[in-house]
Each structure stands twice: as C-alpha cells, then as structure tokens.
Amino acid sequence: MKFHPTRPFGLYFEFFIIISFFFTSESTGDVESFMKYSNVAFSEGLAGFDSLAHVYQALLKKSTCYQEVAATLISKCSLLNTELTIDNRIHSAIQMTLCDFERSQILAPSECVRGSQSECVSKLESTSTWWLSFTSHFHDVNHLCRLANLEMQKELSIEVNMNVTLVQKQFLEMVILHLRNFESVTDKMNQRIDKFDGKFNSVIENSFKDINFRVNQEIMGLVELQNHQQEGMVQQKEILSTIKQLKSEIFDINSFFANFIEESAGYSNSLIEKLNEKFTSENAIALSAIGKYTSEFSAFMEKRIKNLITTTEDSLQQSVQSNIDFVNSGFQPLYDLTIQLKEELQSLKRLSSEQQNLQHEQILQWKSDFLNVSKDHLKVLQQLRPLIDIVEKFMNVYFKGLSNIISSFAFIGFTLFATLSSLFFKVLKIHRRPIIVFGSLSIIFIHIYCFKITSWVNLYGWITCTIARTLSFIKLNIRTFYLTAFLCALLNFLRYLKYRNSKKDTELSLFLPAPEECNIYHNEHIQVQEDNYLCPIENSLIDLFGSENNKEKLGKQENVRFAFLNSESLEQSPWWD
C-alpha cells in the first residue's frame, strides 16, 4: 500500500492510538506486577477487572456505532451465558472495524457491507492497518463478554444478599413482636400472682387469728381445771390433817379410855376403813373426770387442726394448680414458636453456608480466568514492544521533519517582518541607518538559524546557504535577504520530498509483514502456498487466537500474521535509516 499525498497522516496515528489503547491501558501495570510477584494476592489481582471495565466504558463513550455493537455483544453474552463462538467474535470484530472506518471517514469495503463474512475477512487481510484493527477488536470481544457475565454475576450476588437481609429483618421483627406478647403475658401473670399473694396472706392471717382465739379459750379452760384440781388437793390435805387430828384425838381418847378403846377397837377400825374407802373412791372419780375432759379436748383440738390443715392445703393446691395451668397456657405458644424459629435459623444458616461456598468457588474460578487472561495480555504486550519502538522511532523522525519545515516557514516570517519594518520606517520617513542596523541583525540571526537546520543535510545545501550568507553580508538589501530565505526553505522542502518519494514504502516499513522464512532458533524454512506463511505451531513465538482448533476455523493464516514481530524479524532497514 503506497503512501498517498492526500491521505492524512492522522489516519495512521489514529490506528496506532486504537491499538495502544486496548493493549497499553492501566492493565499494563497489573501485568507487570504479576510478572514481578508470582504469588500475588487475589485482592490485588481483582484490579485487572477494572482495566476491562475501562475498555467497556471507553466503548460506551465513543460514537453511537460503537455503543450499538457493544449492546448487541452484551445481549449475546447474556443469552449464551458462555464464551462466544468464533463466528460471533469475528462478526463483532468486523462491526467494530466498520465503526473505525466510519469514524475515520473511510469508505468501507463492499465485501464487508454486502458480502459474506469470509469475504470481508479476506478483504481486511489485504490491508495491514485494516487487519491490525480487526485483530485488536477480535481479542477484546471475548474480554467484553466476560466483563458482561461478571456484571450479571455481581447483580445476582447483590440480589441474593438483599433477600437474605430481608429474611433476617422479617425474622427480627417477628422475634420483637413475640417478645412484646411475652412481656404482656408476664405482666398479667405477675399481677395475678400479686393478687393471689394478697388473698393468701389474708386467709392465713384470719385462720391464725381464729386458731389463736380457740387455743386461748382452751388454755383458759385448762387453767380453770387445774385450779379446781389444786383446790381438791388442798381439800384432800385438809381432810388428811383432820384425820390426823382425829387419830390423835382417838389415841388420846384410847389412852384415856383404854378400856373403852379395847372394847370399841373393832368398831373404830371398821369406821376408819369405811372412811378410807370413801375418800379413795372420790379421788378416783375426780381423776377419771379430769382425764376424760383432757382427752376430749385433745381430740377436739387435733380434729380442728387437721381440718384447718386440709382446708389450707386444698386451697393452696387449687390456687397453685390454676397458676401453673395459666403459666403453661401462656408459655406453650412461645415454646412452639421458639422451636419453629430454631428450625428456620438452621435452614437459613445452611442456605447461607451453601451460598458462601458457591460464591467462594465462583471467585476462585474468576481468579483463575483472570490470571489466564493476564498471561495472554502479557504475551501480546511482549510481542508488541518491538512494534511500539518502531512507531516511536517513526514518530520522532516525522516530528523532526515537521519541525524543520516549520522552522523554514518561521524563517520566511522573519523575512516578511523585516520587509514590513523597512516599509514602515520608509513611510514614516525615518533615517535609513536604523533600518540597515535592524536588517543586519535580523539577517545575522536568521543566517545562524538557517545554518543550524541545513548544515547537516548535504554538501549542496551547505554550499548554497554559504553563498547566500556571503551575498547577504556583502550587500545588505531585501533582495539578498529573500534569496537566503527562499533557498533555506527550498532545501528543507526538497529534503522532505526526497524521503517522501523514496523507493521503500513508509507504511510497509512501519507495519512489517511476516518474513519469507520463520526467524526461529534453527532457521527452519517454511513453504509459501497462496501467500500463506505456514510455520510450525510449536516454534511460534505467540498464538494470538487461543487454541489450535481455532486456527483451522479462521481466515488465511491469521494466527501467524503477527507471530514473528521479534528482534530478528525487524532486521529490514526502514526509510529513516
């Protein structure tokens, strides 16, 4: 492809910017960090996904054509839920290449507009810049699809976490509601217990008052009975003392009436015996009456105490049983609810653990995929380094040539400024000597600058500028000044045309095709069949299109088109050397 004069230089620069944007973005730093540290942490490795997001955002910020292609690509990825097929990737890459044509205001090939997909690929392969744009988009299609899938997985994880949070919120609200019900039931139970305590205390107090009253009455009766018994004993003692007195009197009478006592001894003995029997029977009757009264009182008191204890036990047992039934009726729903909540918590915990395991496995899979993609990017970047060096060299030479041309026009501007100054002073009728001094200084300065940019061109330019400077110093006038400026500008322009019309094509020097032989370690020659470069797969420096099966499905050996951009394949001399 020849360098056409009307074709803008910005087109080649634009294609270079497109390539460098996708392969030298912020992910370059991440790739170098992967090479420097083999065991990189996963938190640092996830930063590479930001680079893919930047690529996706860059496509969205472009024209409507890029946005439509990106939207179609994302919809296909979401429907397939897997990696795109080769046909889909080629179709998307062709559409993005057409967007590049539209953006650069280049007429798209008819094969890509109305022809088949294979014809379009063949047409793009015929031009190196078109093919470079197509291959760069072909690589980025699968990355954008993975980015879309990651966004879908992210939204799904967020939705699952929101559902779990909602379940936890509902569970907490239910627990709070049941706790409030439990508090109300507990308050009612406390009120009933307080009321029961008051009634129980009043019943116990009244019962003890009645018992104390009855016990006091019985004690008073016992005291009175004891008093009567003591009075009987006193009377018995008095009777005994009286009997003693009678005995003494009888003894006196017997002593006085000894004879009479002997006679009446029998009568007296019988009388004493009768009296003893009488007093003994009376004492036995009194003691039996006291024992009978005491046993009856003890039985009555024991019966009353048993009745009181039985009544108290029955009332207490009924009250306690009613309270127990009331408490059981209040706690049974709460117990059932607690069992149900425990089962729900166990199921929720099991579901959460399963979800965490799934997320962990998915993150590990993403990590391995990202490492593989990063390695592929690193290989591509390593092979593009010689191309970047060539482009940098090319840009430096072109900018230097443009600087020389601009310097020539600046030289002409200085000349026009001196001419206008001379005319201005002439119109104002100022003395001519300042004009000569100003013109001399300007010519000296411009000659020095002209010598700087033309002295190293060639011998012819050096001799011409030397003659022009000599004439300028001999005759300081405007004509020689114009001659010097014109010659310097002409030399710079001729130098540009010399390299512009050189035999070696500029574009082919910049984007070098594959050489006629594979520059591998043993310099094994290859066979050339229908303009295809067939190199052994195991000796290729890089495989830009993935597995070996993909190579058989693509166009004319795309997989080795840029496989030999190494230091040995760049031995062809470009035009600037």
From Swiss-Prot:
Cytoplasmic side: 426-433, 492-577
Similarity remark: Belongs to the KAR5 family.
Cell location: Endoplasmic reticulum membrane; Nucleus membrane
Organism for this UniProt entry: Schizosaccharomyces pombe (strain 972 / ATCC 24843) (Fission yeast)
Transmembrane regions: 405-425, 434-454, 471-491
Matching Pfam families: Tht1
Protein name, entry field: Nuclear fusion protein tht1
Record membrane topology: Multi-pass membrane protein
Key word Cell inner membrane present: no
Lumenal side: 30-404, 455-470
Task of the protein: Required for nuclear membrane fusion during karyogamy.
Keyword Membrane included in the entry's annotation: yes
InterPro entries attached to this UniProt entry: Nuclear_fusion_Kar5 (IPR007292)
Residue positions the entry lists as glycosylated: N163, N372
Keywords: Endoplasmic reticulum, Glycoprotein, Karyogamy, Membrane, Nucleus, Signal, Transmembrane, Transmembrane helix
